[in-house]
């Protein structure tokens, strides 16, 4: 069914690209049913936990998303997309079953954050790296990435909406059953996924050439000098390439303020907006509606606008949308803010992924994306140390408004004062 809908809405994509979009849509919908409601919602509403507990949950999740993304990138580079996808499916099913089996106590919710974070990170290359195994054409990559982003954002509508209804009818923990169901559907959609043979052969040839070069410098085989690029080489690739290095810094600095949102949003709903746990799903769905519109906008961007400057404008719009979202105590205004926020994110994600995929070497792409993801997630981890103190000192809403100001100010400052570096990177 999802393949049929994708075929109708994206007729220009190849069959394998449509299958990839369906794979990402289904597994990501499963994640979206569960994270916000199943972990943060359980802690806030069912357990009555403190801001410290929700901050710990977000910290654990972000740390293990980072670890999972490194593991997933390594698995992709070593074994290719098909085996990586199967491991993602098995890990997600095992996580859902474990969380359901062990109850909803605070300790279990925190352990669930660890497991869920790891499998979400492990599965990230499906969206960030798989497209490069289908084509190396920049325009086609932009179209695939925009379609993935658009349907990922449909996931942000469908997943939290269904999760909200399940939480209202049963419990916040029951959403993990939905996650497992969508994961099984993703397995069905991805069963016939086949990367382009030329692309896979090219990756293997690059690995073989590197292996030959290293073998000529050694008397015997050494696993530490494997043919495959190490993480150290991927880190070097990021920071010796002007575009990738600047992109890493942009995403890190722009997301630094956003890290305060995750542990405090549920308290904003409960104590400022005065709504129930189901609204955590429904307001997230509003963001998904906006993100679909943003992805459609990204799909229509001309090639000359697929660059770092456009990305900064989109990131600044994320900050402005977040200010509208948390700036008042009215749920209607928060709804509009979530739509605006979603539109901005819908443009950011395909731009970011396309820039990375057209810049990084394919044989290192999985781990280069892991390095980029590390910067993104670490930026979200750092504010968690002070989020509870800020909320206790200034209040939840004021802290969120301050975070929104940071998210807005960083890309604005980079646009105003970093134009020379941006121009140099764009020319290269």
Where are these predicted regions, by residue range?
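Helix-loop junctions at membrane interfaces in 12-TM secondary transporters
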Residues: 101-113, 326-337
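C-terminal ends and interior cores of transmembrane alpha-helices
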Residues: 90-104, 316-329
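Substrate-agnostic recognition of the 12-TM MFS/MFS-like secondary transporter fold
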Residues: 19-36, 61-74, 80-89, 108-168, ...
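Helix-loop boundary and gating motifs at the non-cytosolic
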Residues: 2-63, 241-285
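Transmembrane alpha-helix termini and helix-breaking/packing motifs in multi-pass membrane transporters
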Residues: 38-46, 158-179, 271-272, 382-400
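Cytoplasmic membrane-interface "Motif A"-like loop-to-helix N-cap segments
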Residues: 78-89, 303-315
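Helix-loop junctions on the cytosolic side of multi-pass membrane transporters
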Residues: 182-207, 416-427
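Juxtamembrane intracellular "pre-TM" segments in multi-pass secondary transporters
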Residues: 1-17, 196-248
């Amino acid at each position: 069914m999802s393949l049929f809908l994708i075929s109708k809405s994206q007729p220009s994509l190849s069959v394998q690209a449509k299958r990839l979009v369906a794979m990402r849509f289904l597994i990501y919908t499963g994640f979206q049913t569960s994270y916000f409601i199943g972990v943060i919602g359980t802690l806030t509403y069912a357990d009555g936990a403190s801001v410290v507990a929700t901050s710990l949950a977000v910290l654990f999740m972000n740390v293990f998303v980072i670890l999972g993304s490194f593991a997933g990138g390594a698995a992709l580079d070593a074994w290719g997309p098909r085996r990586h996808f199967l491991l993602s499916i098995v890990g997600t099913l095992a996580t859902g079953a474990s969380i359901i089996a062990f109850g909803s106590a605070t300790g279990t919710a925190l352990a669930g954050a660890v497991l869920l974070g790891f499998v979400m990170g492990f599965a990230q290359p499906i969206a960030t790296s798989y497209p490069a195994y289908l084509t190396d054409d920049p325009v086609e990559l932009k179209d695939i990435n925009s379609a993935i982003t658009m349907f990922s954002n449909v996931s942000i509508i469908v997943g939290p909406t269904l999760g909200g209804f399940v939480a209202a009818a049963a419990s916040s923990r029951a959403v993990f059953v939905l996650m497992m169901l969508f994961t099984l559907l993703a397995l069905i959609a991805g069963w016939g996924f086949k990367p382009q043979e030329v692309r896979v052969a090219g990756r293997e040839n690059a690995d073989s050439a590197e292996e030959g070069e290293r073998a000529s410098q050694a008397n015997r085989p050494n696993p530490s000098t494997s043919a495959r690029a190490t993480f150290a080489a991927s880190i070097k690739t990021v920071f010796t390439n002007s575009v990738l290095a600047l992109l890493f810094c942009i995403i890190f600095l722009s997301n630094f303020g956003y890290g305060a949102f995750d542990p405090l949003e549920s308290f904003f709903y409960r104590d400022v907006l005065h709504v129930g746990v189901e609204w955590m799903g429904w307001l997230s769905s509003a963001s998904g509606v906006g993100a679909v519109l943003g992805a459609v906008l990204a799909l229509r961007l001309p090639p000359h606008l697929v660059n770092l400057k456009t990305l900064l404008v989109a990131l600044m719009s994320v900050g402005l949308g977040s200010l509208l979202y948390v700036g008042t105590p009215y749920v209607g205004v928060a709804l509009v803010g979530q739509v605006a926020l979603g539109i901005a994110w819908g443009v950011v994600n395909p731009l970011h992924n396309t820039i990375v995929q057209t810049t990084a070497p394919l044989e290192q792409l999985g781990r280069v994306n892991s390095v980029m993801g590390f910067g993104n997630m670490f930026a979200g981890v750092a504010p968690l140390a002070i989020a509870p103190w800020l909320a206790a000192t200034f209040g939840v809403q004021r802290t969120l408004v301050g975070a929104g100001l940071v998210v807005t100010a960083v890309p604005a400052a980079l646009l105003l004062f970093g134009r020379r570096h941006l121009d140099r990177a764009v020319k290269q």
